[in-house]
Amino acid sequence: MPTNLKGGVKLRKALREFSPDLAKETIKELGGLLRPVTNKARGYMPAESPLSGWAVRPESKAKFPMYDPNIAKRGIRYKSSPSRANRRGWRALVSILNTSAAGAIYETAGRKNPGGNFSPRLGGERKGQGKLEGRSIFRAWNEDQGKTQGAVIRAIQTASVKFNNRKAKV
Protein backbone atom coordinates (compact mmCIF):
# COMPACT_ATOMS: atom_id res chain seq x y z
CA MET A 1 0.00 0.00 0.00
CA PRO A 2 2.63 2.61 0.85
CA THR A 3 4.53 4.00 -2.14
CA ASN A 4 7.59 6.21 -2.03
CA LEU A 5 6.82 9.35 -4.03
CA LYS A 6 9.46 12.04 -3.58
CA GLY A 7 8.42 15.68 -3.75
CA GLY A 8 4.69 15.01 -3.46
CA VAL A 9 4.13 17.30 -0.49
CA LYS A 10 6.22 20.09 -2.04
CA LEU A 11 4.21 19.75 -5.25
CA ARG A 12 0.91 20.05 -3.34
CA LYS A 13 2.18 23.20 -1.57
CA ALA A 14 3.40 24.74 -4.83
CA LEU A 15 0.10 23.95 -6.55
CA ARG A 16 -1.85 25.56 -3.73
CA GLU A 17 0.33 28.67 -3.79
CA PHE A 18 0.86 29.27 -7.52
CA SER A 19 -1.96 27.40 -9.25
CA PRO A 20 -5.00 26.98 -6.95
CA ASP A 21 -7.28 25.87 -9.79
CA LEU A 22 -4.94 22.97 -10.63
CA ALA A 23 -4.71 22.10 -6.92
CA LYS A 24 -8.51 21.88 -6.66
CA GLU A 25 -8.68 19.82 -9.85
CA THR A 26 -6.09 17.39 -8.47
CA ILE A 27 -7.91 17.01 -5.14
CA LYS A 28 -11.19 16.42 -6.96
CA GLU A 29 -9.53 13.78 -9.16
CA LEU A 30 -8.01 12.03 -6.13
CA GLY A 31 -11.40 12.00 -4.42
CA GLY A 32 -12.97 10.42 -7.49
CA LEU A 33 -10.33 7.69 -7.43
CA LEU A 34 -10.66 6.92 -3.70
CA ARG A 35 -14.46 7.08 -3.46
CA PRO A 36 -15.12 3.61 -5.01
CA VAL A 37 -12.70 1.96 -2.56
CA THR A 38 -14.33 3.68 0.44
CA ASN A 39 -17.79 2.67 -0.78
CA LYS A 40 -16.67 -0.94 -1.18
CA ALA A 41 -15.14 -0.87 2.32
CA ARG A 42 -18.43 0.44 3.75
CA GLY A 43 -20.13 -2.58 2.21
CA TYR A 44 -17.91 -4.92 4.23
CA MET A 45 -18.98 -3.46 7.58
CA PRO A 46 -21.48 -5.74 9.36
CA ALA A 47 -25.12 -4.65 9.51
CA GLU A 48 -25.50 -5.81 13.13
CA SER A 49 -23.29 -5.81 16.17
CA PRO A 50 -20.78 -8.62 15.51
CA LEU A 51 -20.20 -9.32 19.22
CA SER A 52 -22.63 -9.75 22.08
CA GLY A 53 -22.60 -6.78 24.44
CA TRP A 54 -21.35 -4.48 21.71
CA ALA A 55 -24.80 -3.36 20.58
CA VAL A 56 -26.07 0.11 21.39
CA ARG A 57 -28.09 0.19 24.62
CA PRO A 58 -30.49 3.04 25.35
CA GLU A 59 -29.30 4.00 28.83
CA SER A 60 -25.73 2.81 28.95
CA LYS A 61 -23.00 4.89 30.55
CA ALA A 62 -20.27 2.61 29.25
CA LYS A 63 -17.10 4.24 28.01
CA PHE A 64 -16.23 1.48 25.53
CA PRO A 65 -17.60 2.40 22.07
CA MET A 66 -20.80 0.60 21.14
CA TYR A 67 -21.19 -0.66 17.57
CA ASP A 68 -23.70 1.29 15.51
CA PRO A 69 -23.52 0.12 11.87
CA ASN A 70 -24.54 3.50 10.45
CA ILE A 71 -21.85 5.37 12.39
CA ALA A 72 -19.25 2.71 11.55
CA LYS A 73 -20.05 2.94 7.83
CA ARG A 74 -20.09 6.73 7.82
CA GLY A 75 -16.75 6.70 9.62
CA ILE A 76 -14.97 5.21 6.59
CA ARG A 77 -13.73 8.16 4.57
CA TYR A 78 -10.80 9.32 2.55
CA LYS A 79 -8.49 12.19 3.34
CA SER A 80 -6.69 14.05 0.58
CA SER A 81 -4.58 16.33 2.76
CA PRO A 82 -1.04 15.23 3.65
CA SER A 83 -0.54 13.73 7.10
CA ARG A 84 2.06 14.84 9.62
CA ALA A 85 5.44 13.20 9.24
CA ASN A 86 5.98 10.18 11.45
CA ARG A 87 9.23 9.63 13.37
CA ARG A 88 10.85 8.18 10.25
CA GLY A 89 9.84 11.17 8.14
CA TRP A 90 7.13 9.45 6.07
CA ARG A 91 3.92 11.28 5.15
CA ALA A 92 0.73 10.11 3.49
CA LEU A 93 -0.47 12.28 0.61
CA VAL A 94 -3.89 10.59 0.58
CA SER A 95 -5.36 8.01 2.95
CA ILE A 96 -8.50 6.00 3.64
CA LEU A 97 -9.37 5.70 7.33
CA ASN A 98 -12.16 4.83 9.73
CA THR A 99 -12.91 7.73 12.06
CA SER A 100 -15.44 5.86 14.22
CA ALA A 101 -13.97 4.08 17.24
CA ALA A 102 -16.13 0.96 16.92
CA GLY A 103 -15.44 0.72 13.19
CA ALA A 104 -11.70 1.01 13.75
CA ILE A 105 -11.86 -1.71 16.41
CA TYR A 106 -13.77 -4.01 14.03
CA GLU A 107 -11.23 -3.28 11.29
CA THR A 108 -8.14 -4.21 13.32
CA ALA A 109 -9.41 -6.64 16.01
CA GLY A 110 -7.25 -9.71 16.39
CA ARG A 111 -4.30 -8.25 14.51
CA LYS A 112 -1.97 -8.20 17.52
CA ASN A 113 -2.21 -11.97 18.15
CA PRO A 114 -3.15 -13.55 14.82
CA GLY A 115 -2.38 -17.06 16.08
CA GLY A 116 -4.97 -16.85 18.84
CA ASN A 117 -8.68 -17.25 18.27
CA PHE A 118 -9.84 -13.70 19.01
CA SER A 119 -13.49 -14.31 18.29
CA PRO A 120 -14.86 -16.48 15.53
CA ARG A 121 -18.17 -14.58 15.76
CA LEU A 122 -16.50 -11.35 14.69
CA GLY A 123 -16.48 -12.64 11.13
CA GLY A 124 -15.19 -10.72 8.19
CA GLU A 125 -12.23 -11.98 6.27
CA ARG A 126 -9.00 -10.18 7.16
CA LYS A 127 -6.83 -9.24 4.20
CA GLY A 128 -3.28 -7.92 4.09
CA GLN A 129 -0.32 -8.59 6.35
CA GLY A 130 0.97 -7.20 9.63
CA LYS A 131 0.04 -3.58 10.27
CA LEU A 132 -1.65 -3.44 6.86
CA GLU A 133 -4.25 -6.08 7.72
CA GLY A 134 -7.95 -5.49 8.24
CA ARG A 135 -11.53 -6.55 7.59
CA SER A 136 -13.07 -3.74 5.53
CA ILE A 137 -10.69 -1.01 4.32
CA PHE A 138 -7.72 -3.29 3.73
CA ARG A 139 -9.98 -5.94 2.18
CA ALA A 140 -11.42 -3.41 -0.29
CA TRP A 141 -7.92 -2.13 -1.07
CA ASN A 142 -6.63 -5.69 -1.55
CA GLU A 143 -9.46 -6.52 -3.96
CA ASP A 144 -8.67 -3.36 -5.92
CA GLN A 145 -5.25 -4.93 -6.68
CA GLY A 146 -3.34 -1.66 -6.89
CA LYS A 147 -5.46 -0.07 -9.64
CA THR A 148 -6.37 2.90 -7.47
CA GLN A 149 -2.81 3.25 -6.20
CA GLY A 150 -1.47 3.44 -9.74
CA ALA A 151 -4.19 5.91 -10.74
CA VAL A 152 -3.39 8.15 -7.74
CA ILE A 153 0.31 8.19 -8.65
CA ARG A 154 -0.55 8.98 -12.29
CA ALA A 155 -2.85 11.82 -11.16
CA ILE A 156 -0.09 13.36 -9.05
CA GLN A 157 2.43 12.99 -11.87
CA THR A 158 -0.01 14.55 -14.35
CA ALA A 159 -0.53 17.49 -12.00
CA SER A 160 3.24 17.86 -11.75
CA VAL A 161 3.63 17.92 -15.54
CA LYS A 162 0.78 20.45 -15.94
CA PHE A 163 2.27 22.64 -13.21
CA ASN A 164 5.74 22.55 -14.77
CA ASN A 165 4.28 23.41 -18.20
CA ARG A 166 2.44 26.40 -16.72
CA LYS A 167 5.56 27.48 -14.88
CA ALA A 168 7.64 27.25 -18.08
CA LYS A 169 5.18 29.50 -19.95
CA VAL A 170 5.53 32.28 -17.35
Q: What are these model-predicted stretches?
A:
Residues K13-K127, N164-V170:
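Short, low-complexity, charged/polar segments at coil/turn and helix-coil boundaries
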